[in-house]
């Protein structure tokens, strides 16, 4: 009988210890579970939709980090820093603005974490007035910083779709010189931009696609939708004879973890028709060895 009681007591202790170990393991698993990119993006989009409808510039600007950048094919250039971003939204929602009392719809095509604290996403947007008439629509490819269980815009690179006939011009505007920076990996990103121009003007789709990471994202005005991966980027890239691309690099930020964002302007001249198009770009790069690969390209045309 004593042996039975001793054995039962020992088994009970083992059972309790086992339960504790299982509980501890579950708690540890919960603690280290990676954040869900899709859920975070959906919540961010829902907040933006609600805050946009409220017309509260301060609240919308609060969705951006203090050092964020907006590249939105604005003729005046990129909008850099929290104060400038707040002012841009005050103008957006001001009386007399086309966007006053407007609403925004956001479509999400792709989202993923690229480091512990950096997330990217790409998709579509549509802005309508109170009568549901579309004011503006287009595509976006944004970079977000993750902190305290949520994400904020670090780089908004969103570009409206325009009719080519409305934005093609006979003017041949000059493109300003690129910046020079001593920040880490800047020269690699600078080389990537130069190679993009080189391969585009050579009409080499294969070489251009190799400038991207294997799972790179391309969101550009010249293509429908969001293009995913090198193979699709290559197969959807076409060139027209007589078109010459030029671009500059006007801003750069090293993000650590072999990631960097950069932005600038581009211009394309058609020598046959003597016309030009211009726009802006805001991209995310991943540095591997001596090369900066495009992890996400997001570029659009300026009206």
Put a short name on every predicted segment.
Residues 1-8:
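Bacterial N-terminal signal peptides that target proteins for export
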Residues 8-15:
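Bacterial N-terminal signal peptides
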């Amino acid at each position: 009988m004593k042996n039975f009681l001793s054995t039962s007591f020992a088994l009970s202790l083992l059972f309790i210890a086992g339960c504790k170990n299982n509980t501890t393991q579950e708690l540890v698993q919960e603690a280290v579970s990676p954040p869900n990119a899709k859920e975070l993006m959906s919540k961010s989009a829902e907040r933006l939709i609600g805050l946009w409808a409220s017309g509260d510039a301060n609240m919308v600007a609060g969705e951006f980090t203090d050092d964020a950048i907006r590249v939105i094919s604005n003729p005046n250039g990129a909008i850099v820093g929290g104060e400038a971003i707040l002012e841009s939204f005050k103008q957006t929602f001001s009386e007399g603005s086309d966007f006053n009392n407007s609403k925004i719809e956001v479509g999400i095509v792709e989202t993923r974490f690229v480091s512990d604290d950096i997330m990217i996403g790409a998709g579509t947007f549509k802005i309508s007035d109170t009568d549901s008439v579309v004011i503006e629509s287009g595509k976006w490819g944004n970079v977000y910083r993750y902190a305290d269980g949520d994400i904020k815009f670090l780089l908004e690179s969103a570009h409206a779709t325009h009719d080519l006939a409305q934005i093609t011009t006979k003017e041949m505007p000059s493109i300003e010189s690129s910046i020079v920076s001593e920040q880490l990996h800047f020269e690699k990103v600078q080389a990537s931009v130069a190679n993009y121009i080189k391969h585009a003007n050579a009409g080499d789709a294969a070489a251009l696609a190799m400038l991207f990471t294997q799972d790179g994202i391309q969101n550009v005005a010249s293509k429908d939708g969001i293009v995913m991966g090198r193979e699709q980027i290559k197969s959807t890239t076409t060139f027209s004879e007589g078109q010459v691309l030029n671009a500059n690099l006007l801003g750069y930020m090293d993000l650590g973890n072999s990631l960097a964002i950069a932005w600038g302007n581009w211009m394309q001249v058609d020598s046959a028709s003597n016309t030009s198009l211009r726009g802006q770009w805001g991209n995310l790069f991943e540095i591997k060895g001596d090369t900066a690969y495009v992890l996400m390209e997001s570029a659009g045309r300026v009206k």
